[in-house]
Amino acid sequence: MRNYKELKHEKNGNVTEKIGENKGKSKKMSKDESLLSFDLFLEGKEHSAYKFMGAHFITENRKRGVRFTTWSPRASKIYIIGDFNNWELKEEYSMKKINERGIWSLFIPKLEEGIKYKFAVENECGNNTVYKSDPYAFKSELRPNTASVLTKIKSFRWGDKRWLNKREKEGLDNKPMNIYELHLGSWKRKDGEFMTYEEISEVLVEYIKEMGYTHVEFMPVNEHPLDASWGYQGVGYYSVTSRYGDLNGLKTLINKLHKNNIGVLLDWVPSHFCKDEHGLFMFDGSPTYEYEVWWKANNEGWGTCNFDLGRPEVKSFLFSNAMYWINEFHVDGLRVDAVSNMLYLDYGREYGEWEPNIYGENGNLEAIAFLKELNTIIKKEGKGAITVAEESTSWEGITKSVEEGGLGFDYKWNMGWMNDTLSYIELDPIYRKYHHNKMNFSMMYNYSEKFILPISHDEVVHGKKSLINKMWGDDWKKYAGLRLYASFMMGHPGKKLMFMGCEFGQFVEWREWEELQWSVIEEFDIHRKTKEYFKALNKFYLENSSLWSLDYEEEGFKWMDADNSEESVLSFIRIGKNKKEKLIFICNFTPEVYYDFKVGVPELGEYVEVFNSDSLEFGGVGNIMGDSILKATEESFKDFDYSISVKVPPLGTLVLKVK
């Protein structure tokens, strides 16, 4: 393979390259480094391809300019077109093919930041030209325009070293994790228009601190053509979306969150990409980033194309992209979207529309290997960054380590729990006793994976109704049901995720084209009280380690009564690491008050109320114990030697502990 000097057709040129944040100093690329970089890229082992692929401002032979490099294995010719040459195909801007595996490169002097450009790629036969944005561009035009924009990864003064050091040393399994999922374009707006990353930081950080969430999860922030895709059908995997600003704007937001002890997760989509003609689709007129076989490449259900996860150069593209967000933007983890679509060859396909693997099964062996390698890389190089799988099936070993034969994710969304419990709370309480298993079944498999309990954006859109509107009954019953559901969720083992707007009971579904209905908090007392309830519940969660310190250990949870279907009541104990930290949850899913309700308790002593979802301050009717003390008796009940009798609020949760 040619070295970097041959790549420029210069024997003695001095190459300096300013890439990423290197304290503002130029870095000289040696012959060995350049050879290693391209070899690893072509082998599917490169984890920082963005440092040499794409467009980089460098000095070559004492001339300042931009080095363009791309991968296009079947192209017969590639021109760089842009503002600087009137978008014309000129021979002097024809890229040089530097190896037979499809690496193309060209240095153009005297280019400045802000110049728009594309690659004009002629196909293998030379009879068709496609105009493509740069897959590795750091900036793209604001939609509907589609060109890439020359920009530098400028130095940024981070102030989150303490946060990152703590992240690397401490895991999250035995820590609180209460995630606020949000879409940056519709959380809040300014005069109906998008806010910048910096403007968002001024209000979001204070709101998250006020509400007591530990993490935020951003829906995708890479460039995407269609607002309605929410970022999940991407084009510019390395471009921070121009809707809200630039790279340093996003870094400012993340830095401020970290300095206020708030973690940042990012939704990431290595499964599929959009078919817009300026993007990755048929990059050189033939399958490049997608599978060669059309049935495997085409994702008809989503109108997208699936990445070829077995192709080395595509793997380098995606591995590098994952590390780009972790290294350059300090994100604390990636929530990997649509994992089921990756794992199954027959996902979304009917009989006859797919072919089995070499073992006659439906598992995508290339995707399985890709995910294992991805998680291994992040565990090794991510300095404590985590990965979360959005996976909706019963595939085994999602969060089991790669060494033990698993995929190696840190956490998995518990879609089963979400589907079961949401279908239950929509039922009239008269019929709930016939579906009691929907609320207790999750504990049958709870310790098979490390789960996050998600109420995500997908559940409050496209006719599914807002979370408050999923609740049964009139307005009072809906808000009581919401408080009950949220407290049951907080008591259930597993980390938590709640989508924006649910925390104040927004009635309308989420709409990506407008901000949340913040005005209702001021206009209607029940919305204000609902927000205060979530704030208090989050605080209660943070202050009680029994709710998170043993999420993934069986000794952290014990049923008091899992089978009271007739009265639709669930009662259980959450236990902390020191075993003395115990909280008793009694959840009543009917609108009836239960007087002198008997439950078994683990020890003889005095029990006091520490949380009640029916408090007047939260919009309830006030069926609370207050300062009353309940003395346990030696009368056994169920599997316990002792018992107490309590008043359980309607559509409410009562939480007790030993005084």
From Swiss-Prot:
Transmembrane segments: none annotated. Coiled coil: none annotated. Pfam families: Alpha-amylase, Alpha-amylase_C, CBM_48. Gene3D superfamilies: Glycosidases, Golgi alpha-mannosidase II, Immunoglobulins. Keywords: Carbohydrate metabolism, Glycogen biosynthesis, Glycogen metabolism, Glycosyltransferase, Transferase. Residues 1-26 are annotated as: Disordered. The active site is at D337, E390. It catalyses: Transfers a segment of a (1->4)-alpha-D-glucan chain to a primary hydroxy group in a similar glucan chain. One of its GO terms (molecular function) is cation binding. Its EC number is 2.4.1.18. GO terms for cellular component: cytosol. One of its GO terms (biological process) is glycogen biosynthetic process. Pathway: Glycan biosynthesis; glycogen biosynthesis. Belongs to the glycosyl hydrolase 13 family. GlgB subfamily. Monomer. Catalyzes the formation of the alpha-1,6-glucosidic linkages in glycogen by scission of a 1,4-alpha-linked oligosaccharide from growing alpha-1,4-glucan chains and the subsequent attachment of the oligosaccharide to the alpha-1,6 position. This is 1,4-alpha-glucan branching enzyme GlgB 2. It comes from Clostridium perfringens (strain SM101 / Type A). The lineage of its organism: Bacteria, Bacillati, Bacillota, Clostridia, Eubacteriales.
